[in-house]
């Protein structure tokens, strides 16, 4: 009986297919293109010494890409099916030892240990997270897809012109000394 139940859970996870534009708790899910994921991590200069956190991590592509670079990475995602899919994809990519996914609310997540935040969120989400950003240690890097942090000036901006159809701008912010 236990084997049948486990088999049913695995099948349900395999049957889950995220759809771009599906409604989430605080935003719709739109995946960042693989090319822009790499551009964002390049802009943030992610190394094996980094701890990358992605709030609203979706299918885990940013976390998995950071882990492939040797960084430890954490994805915080509200949708439990997305969390399970992300864990499965991390196992398949061979980075489950460095890529962790938790079910949770991005507004309640502890981001204090991050050296890099990688985000694709709407301006209203970023505005709501701003107090958490301001509490981060100096030197922490925040890299965002397309939507900048309201009223913050990015330290660097790069637009991807190839291999990206929409939402193709990476912006980097560095937390200044206090």
Feature-to-residue mapping (PLM):
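Bacterial N-terminal signal peptides
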Residues: 1-7
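S-adenosyl-L-methionine
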Residues: 10-50, 80-113
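Conserved class I S-adenosyl-L-methionine
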Residues: 49-58
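Conserved SAM-binding loop of SAM-dependent methyltransferases across substrates and taxa
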Residues: 59-71
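Conserved SAM-binding motif I beta-strand of class I
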Residues: 72-77
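A short SAM/SAH-binding and catalytic strip from SAM-dependent methyltransferases
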Residues: 112-128
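C-terminal substrate-binding/active-site "lid" region of AdoMet-derived donor-dependent transferases
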Residues: 124-178
């Amino acid at each position: 009986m236990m084997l049948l139940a486990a088999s049913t859970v695995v099948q349900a996870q395999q049957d889950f297919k995220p759809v771009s534009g599906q409604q989430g708790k605080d935003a719709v899910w739109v995946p960042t293109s693989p090319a822009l994921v790499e551009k964002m991590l390049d802009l943030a200069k992610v190394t094996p010494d980094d701890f990358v956190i992605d709030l609203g991590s979706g299918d885990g592509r940013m976390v998995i890409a950071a882990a492939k670079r040797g960084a430890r990475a954490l994805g915080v995602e509200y949708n439990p099916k997305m969390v399970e899919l992300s864990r499965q994809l991390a196992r398949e990519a061979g980075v489950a030892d460095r890529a962790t996914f938790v079910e949770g609310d991005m507004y309640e997540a502890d981001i204090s240990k991050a050296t890099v935040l990688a985000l694709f969120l709407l301006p209203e989400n970023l505005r709501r997270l701003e107090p958490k950003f301001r509490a981060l240690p100096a030197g922490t890097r925040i890299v965002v897809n397309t939507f900048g942090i309201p009223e913050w000036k990015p330290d660097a901006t790069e637009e991807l012109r190839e291999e990206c159809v929409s939402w193709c701008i990476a912006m980097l912010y560095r937390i200044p000394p206090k």
